[in-house]
């Protein structure tokens, strides 16, 4: 039996396969183990991956990047609004949904984010099939801990449209622990693990408890203001300043020149993880002027020191939030391509001097490898080396029901607080006037991170054709069951008549 694990990040995607008891990442047709999560549209074709990324300088308005940031979001979502402002590919609202406006000259197309993700998933499936054959379509897909129900559903919809059979969605930190087999080396012991993920656009931190081979998420936090792109941007700004110093031309306002500098800065950043210096040469950067600049690792570290400090302060903040000290952490797992940066690794080691830093698996491969292992567990574990891992996921957001108070104002009741271990079951009694013939239970979610949090409706259950009563109230019992993958089953029952309605919000099948 064979299965697939896929990790879709904001800037890149990676696919791993489980076969013959082992999991490993598969290189794409260009020989790269990580594929840019970029889709470019031309008059006759849709281009995915490195070729799309390389062509964006001349086709920027029809090139979609960072689609994960807008997937499953509405136009009034603050993160979607930020994305729309920054996107070089025009995003509009059409028929109540966000669409990319693609103009290739012959026609104008309106493409939804799910279709973009479908193309990326199709590329991942094609890559997996190169080693497994076309019959292997079972997949486990990773999601950030703070993904909401609508985002999970949109991701699952795109995966199924690409031809995948989605076995489960699992949280990224859980996949990272699976990749290292944490819990198998000391199945009867208890340990606390910090998962440090520095991706392309954000820093995600999680504290996980492993006890007798069982995983539990204790606390988590994401900072969208620190990511690999911010390190690249910092270096690109330095290169622009050096160009201005040498040639008296300020190119910081020139989009084409800055895109070239960003490309060069990204290559240099990668090189500086293994080399002491990197050369940035750009042919005809601006007005026919070539640019050649050597950047040392020491210079890069100095430029990015504020970003390094933010990463370390974020770790300290999460430890405080968890009620832990650095001494309470037993291992640190590194994920995300930018966690390769040597200076960052040294700062983390300094914070946890007695702790094992796990980075033997390439950081941008560890999450899809864990997903492939989970897929192997699900399709049959008789040959799997990591046989007994059991993840206990927890709810990423507050799940609430909406009611009204005595004054008629909206009142929300939290049934599943963020961090509730899954699976879990809750009951809620909704009282409604007996004179009405239908009752609606509305379900909301909230990130619960601050006092100004906003509740977002994601589902409702309507109990109709109820017998009216002249006096009194009727009691409606709502039973909500959330499974380990975050899918939710809701049953509403009229306690007097037994009339019942139910819905299921599936996120992984």
From Swiss-Prot:
Coarse class of the protein's main subcellular location: cytoplasm
One GO CC term on file: ribosome
Any one GO MF annotation of this record: ATP binding
UniProt keyword annotation of Cytoplasm present: yes
The entry's keywords: ATP-binding, Chaperone, Cytoplasm, Nucleotide-binding
Localization per record: Cytoplasm, Cytosol
Residue ranges of the TM segments: none
Entry keyword Repeat: no
Function: Component of the ribosome-associated complex (RAC), a complex involved in folding or maintaining nascent polypeptides in a folding-competent state. In the RAC complex, binds to the nascent polypeptide chain, while DNAJC2 stimulates its ATPase activity.
Oligomer and partners: Component of ribosome-associated complex (RAC), a heterodimer composed of Hsp70/DnaK-type chaperone HSPA14 and Hsp40/DnaJ-type chaperone DNAJC2.
Family in the record: Belongs to the heat shock protein 70 family.
Protein name per the record: Heat shock 70 kDa protein 14
Source organism (scientific name): Macaca fascicularis
């Amino acid at each position: 039996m064979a299965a697939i694990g896929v990790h879709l990040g904001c800037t890149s995607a990676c696919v791993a396969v489980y076969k013959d008891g082992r999991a490993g990442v598969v290189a794409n047709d260009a020989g790269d183990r990580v594929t840019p999560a970029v889709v470019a549209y031309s008059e006759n074709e849709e281009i995915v991956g490195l070729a799309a990324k390389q062509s964006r300088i001349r086709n920027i308005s029809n090139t979609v990047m960072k689609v994960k940031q807008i997937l499953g979001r509405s136009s009034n979502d603050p993160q979607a609004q930020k994305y729309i402002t920054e996107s070089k590919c025009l995003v509009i609202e059409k028929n109540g949904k966000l669409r990319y406006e693609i103009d290739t000259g012959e026609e104008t197309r309106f493409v939804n984010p799910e279709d973009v993700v479908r193309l990326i998933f199709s590329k991942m499936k094609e890559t997996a099939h190169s080693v497994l054959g076309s019959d292997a379509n079972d997949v486990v897909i990773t999601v950030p801990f703070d993904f909401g129900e609508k985002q999970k559903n949109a991701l699952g919809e795109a995966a199924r449209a690409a031809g995948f059979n989605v076995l489960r969605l699992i949280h990224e930190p859980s996949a990272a622990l699976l990749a290292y087999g944490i819990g198998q080396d000391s199945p009867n012991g208890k340990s606390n693990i910090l998962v440090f993920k520095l991706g392309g656009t954000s820093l995600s931190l999680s504290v996980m408890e492993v006890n007798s081979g069982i995983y539990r998420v204790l606390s988590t936090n994401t900072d969208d203001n620190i990511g690999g792109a911010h390190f690249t941007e910092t270096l690109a700004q330095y290169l622009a300043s050096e160009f201005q110093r040498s040639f008296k031309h300020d190119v910081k306002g020139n989009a084409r020149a800055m895109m070239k500098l960003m490309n060069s800065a990204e290559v240099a950043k990668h090189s500086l993880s293994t080399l002491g210096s990197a050369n940035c040469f750009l042919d005809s950067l601006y007005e026919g002027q070539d640019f050649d600049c050597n950047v040392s690792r020491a210079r890069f570290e100095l430029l990015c020191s504020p970003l390094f400090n933010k990463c370390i302060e974020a770790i300290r903040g999460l430890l405080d939030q968890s009620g832990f000290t650095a001494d309470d952490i037993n291992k640190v797992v590194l994920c995300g391509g930018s966690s390769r940066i040597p200076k960052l690794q040294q700062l983390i080691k300094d914070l946890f001097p007695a702790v094992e830093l796990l980075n033997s698996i390439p950081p941008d491969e560890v999450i899809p490898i864990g997903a492939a292992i989970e897929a192997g567990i699900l399709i049959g574990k008789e040959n799997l080396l990591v046989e007994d891992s059991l993840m206990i996921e927890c709810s990423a957001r507050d799940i609430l029901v909406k009611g009204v108070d005595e004054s008629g104002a909206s009142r929300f009741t939290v049934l599943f607080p963020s961090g509730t271990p899954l699976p879990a079951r809750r009951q809620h009694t909704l009282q409604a006037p007996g004179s009405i013939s239908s009752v609606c239970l509305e379900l909301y979610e909230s990130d619960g991170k601050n006092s100004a949090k906003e509740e977002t409706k994601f589902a409702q259950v309507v109990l109709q054709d109820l017998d009216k009563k002249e006096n009194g109230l009727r009691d409606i019992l709502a039973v909500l069951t959330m499974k380990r993958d975050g899918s939710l089953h809701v049953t509403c029952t009229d306690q007097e008549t037994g009339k019942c309605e139910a819905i299921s919000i599936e996120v992984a099948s």
